[in-house]
Each structure stands twice: as C-alpha cells, then as structure tokens.
C-alpha cells in the first residue's frame, strides 16, 4: 500500500512538473490605452450635410484593454487576443453617447503534424505585401491599417493550411468563413460572403514574390493578386503589388429623372470588364537611419473625372433637398447614404503617396509622416504620428491629420482635420 501511495505521489508530481513546464512556454501581456480624439467636421459637406448622414462624433474618449495570451510548443500553438473598449462619443448639440464593446480580435489554434505543415483554425489578421498606402494584392485587407498605428485591424474567421517543402517556398490554402464580428456563416444579411484563397510565396536571398487566387462563394468571379519586392544594396527597397478581377459590385453615379437628379447603381456588376489596382513603390534608407517611401497607385475601379463630377452633382442636389422640408427628404437621405457607402475603397483612379519615418530602434520618440494625393481632383491628406516612451511600461502618443481640397473632392468632403492623443501602459 505504501508503495502504491509513493507511486501515486510521484505520478502526481510528474504531472505537476509537466504542467509547469508547459506554462513556462506560454506568455501573457496586458496593454491599456486611454485616448481622446477631436474631429473638425466639414461644415458645408455635400455628402454629410449637418452631419445628418454619417453622424460622425466631433470628439471621442476611449479606454481600451488588450490582453495577449500565447502558448507555443513544438507540436502546437494557441493564441488569444480578447479586447474590451469603452467609448464616450460627443456629438455637440445632440449630446454624448456611450458604448461598451468586448470581442476577440484574434484567437488561433495551430497544429504542426509534421515539420513542413501548419494547420490552423480561428480568428486571425492576414496581412502580406510591402505596400504602405494600400494593399491591392490582398482581397481581405485592401485597407492595411498602417495610416494609424494605434488602431488594430479586426481579425477574420479562417481555416488555413500552410505547407513549406523548402525554406524558400510555401503554399497556403485558406477559407474565410466569418468576418470576425459574430456569427460564422457562409452568407450574412450584412453582405458578408465566404472566401477561399490559395497563396504561393517564394523567398530568395534579397527578394520575395507572392501570388494568390481567391473567390467569394457567390456569383463573383475569381480574383488574382501578386506582390514582389527586392533589396538593392543596403539602402534601396523596390516593390510592386496588384490585384485583378472581372466586374465590380461598386455603385456608380447615373443620371435619372428624379428629385435628386440621379442615383448610385452597380454599373459593372454583370460585365466582363477587368478591374485592377496596381501599386509601384520604393523605399530608401538615409545615412541618418530615416527611411523615405514613395508609391504610385493606379485603380481603375475608381471614378473617371466625369463620374466624379456627376457623383458630387447628385450629392449636391440631395443635400439641397434635405436643406428644406420636402416629401423627397427620404430619397435624398438614401441617395447620400449610397454615396458614402458605394463599395469603393478609393474614390479616384490615380494616387501618389509619400512616407518618411525614423528608425524605430533609435532612442527618443518614434515618428512617421505620411501624405496621400489624389492626382485627379487635387485633394490630399497629410498625417503625423509620434510616440514617446517616457517609462519602461508607459508611452505617450499622438496622431494628427489634415485634409485639403474643395468640398467636391475625395479627401476634403467630410473632415477638415483631426487629432488623437493618448497614453498606453503595459500592466503585464
């Protein structure tokens, strides 16, 4: 009996020791952010007269908690990133609103059945490509989130398998079955459509190339994407990125004999027109360690000059109808809502982008300057970001944005300027 008790005790101790060793392979981090933002709304906006359509808050105070948990072994990896945010939104004369959100931004289980294979299931942020302005090769994240380092991209629900037969070559198959905002469905009322994607990546000594093909599980046609980058010497980086498909469900302005002079309709939803977005750029690192990026984006899904003029003509008519009591006010509101939610990530066709940043490893503040110019309507957006580590576990940050152009231009149609200031602390 004594021998049995000793054996049981030794077994319990072994299990406890194994569990402790497993915990030592994990990590945990808790970050708390507190920030305040103020927006300068365009007073004579044609798209958002009196802020009645977009209902943008003039100011917003937020407190957000970001918990990061990870456990990694040779055979599996588990990560979980729950988030919670409290918002106090200020709308001027209509009074403030409060909101409390909690969600899982990322949560992934990855298995490694063999050394060259990884199989994962859960919620993840799927980013690739070298571009700073936009990511045209990515069918999920064209908006790559790099304009504001303080904001996280929302994860999407995916199942993924990646096979790497060599260190240079990898093949990935993935299926996106949810948008990361709740129910996992193939097709939702809010317009979500499941997506299947195949991606091939090849890494050489100084170059990276990636190709992908994807399809939404609807009548949408396949989409193709590609990116490539190469380093020349120690200072110069050159890259290109693009996406291609047939047709688009985006809304385009059409003249109609109604009270607002037109409507926004899916002009190219059923045709075989090739829709592309292509970016070419480069980065050069100066002797000081600062890096300068210059990019050009061509996007034929955007409006031609005539469509852009018609877009704001219809918006102007709708705004005039809303200015006075009218039986056509509902139509005017619906028209402006369609103008703001037309399915286009960018309104125009040709853009120039400049970014300058310091070396993040430098002592002192980290900073980044960005400027985007619509080459057709002449409007632009300039932004500056800075972050100061004032203590090992505390940092201050600020983001300022300025817009220029007329009220019939892309970048200056809703906002004139905005500023965000805050602090982030690491509790764990």
PLM region descriptions:
Residues 24-30, 80-82, 121, 161, ...:
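Membrane-embedded beta-strand positions of outer-membrane beta-barrel proteins
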Residues 352-356, 388, 413-428:
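Outer-membrane beta-barrel "beta-signal"
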Residues 74-80, 116-119, 168-171, 204-211, ...:
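Repeated loop/turn-to-beta-strand initiation elements of outer-membrane beta-barrel proteins
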Residues 63, 69-176, 405:
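Outer membrane beta-barrel
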Residues 225, 237-357, 369-370, 410-412:
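Extracellular/periplasmic loop regions
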Residues 14-119, 386, 399, 414-422:
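Beta-barrel outer-membrane channel/assembly domains of diderm bacteria
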Residues 57-63, 100-105, 153-157, 192-196, ...:
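Residues that define the transmembrane beta-barrel architecture of outer-membrane proteins
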Residues 30-38, 71-75, 84-90, 123-127, ...:
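Transmembrane beta-strands of outer-membrane beta-barrel pores
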């Amino acid at each position: 009996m004594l021998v049995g008790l000793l054996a049981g005790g030794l077994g319990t101790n072994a299990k406890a020791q194994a569990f402790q060793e497993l915990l030592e392979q994990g990590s945990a981090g808790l970050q708390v952010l507190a920030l305040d933002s103020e927006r300068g709304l365009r007073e004579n906006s044609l798209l958002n007269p009196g802020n009645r359509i977009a209902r943008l808050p003039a100011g917003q105070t937020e407190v957000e908690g970001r918990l990061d948990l990870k456990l990694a072994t040779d055979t599996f990896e588990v990560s979980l990133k729950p988030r919670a945010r409290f918002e106090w939104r200020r709308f001027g004369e209509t009074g403030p609103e409060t909101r409390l959100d909690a969600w899982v931004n990322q949560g992934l289980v990855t298995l490694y059945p063999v050394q060259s294979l990884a199989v994962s299931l859960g919620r993840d942020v799927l980013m690739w490509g070298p571009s700073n302005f936009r990511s045209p090769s990515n069918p999920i994240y064209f908006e790559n989130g790099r304009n504001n380092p303080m904001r996280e991209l929302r994860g999407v629900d995916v199942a993924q398998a990646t096979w790497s037969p060599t260190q240079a070559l990898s093949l990935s198959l993935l299926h996106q079955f949810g948008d990361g905002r709740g129910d996992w469905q193939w097709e939702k009322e809010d317009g979500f459509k499941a997506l299947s994607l195949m991606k091939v990546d090849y890494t050489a000594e100084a170059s990276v190339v990636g190709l992908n093909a994807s399809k939404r599980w609807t009548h949408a046609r396949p989409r193709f994407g590609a990116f490539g980058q190469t380093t020349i010497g120690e200072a110069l980086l050159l890259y290109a990125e693009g996406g291609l498909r047939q047709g688009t469900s985006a809304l385009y302005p059409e003249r109609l004999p109604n009270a607002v002079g037109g409507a926004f309709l899916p002009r190219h939803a059923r045709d075989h027109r090739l829709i592309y977005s292509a970016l070419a750029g480069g980065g050069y690192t100066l002797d000081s360690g600062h890096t300068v990026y210059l990019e050009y984006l061509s996007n034929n899904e955007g409006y031609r000059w005539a469509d852009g003029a018609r877009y704001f003509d219809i918006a102007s008519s709708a705004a005039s109808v809303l200015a006075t009591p009218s039986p056509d006010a509902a139509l005017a509101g619906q028209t402006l809502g369609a103008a703001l939610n037309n399915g286009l990530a960018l309104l125009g066709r040709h853009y120039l982008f400049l970014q300058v940043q310091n070396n993040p490893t430098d002592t002192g503040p980290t900073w980044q300057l960005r400027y985007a110019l619509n080459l057709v309507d002449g409007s632009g957006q300039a932004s500056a970001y800075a972050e100061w580590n004032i203590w090992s576990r505390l940092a201050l940050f600020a983001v300022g944005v300025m817009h220029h152009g007329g009220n019939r231009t892309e970048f200056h149609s809703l906002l004139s300027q905005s500023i965000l200031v805050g602090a982030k602390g690491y509790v764990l």
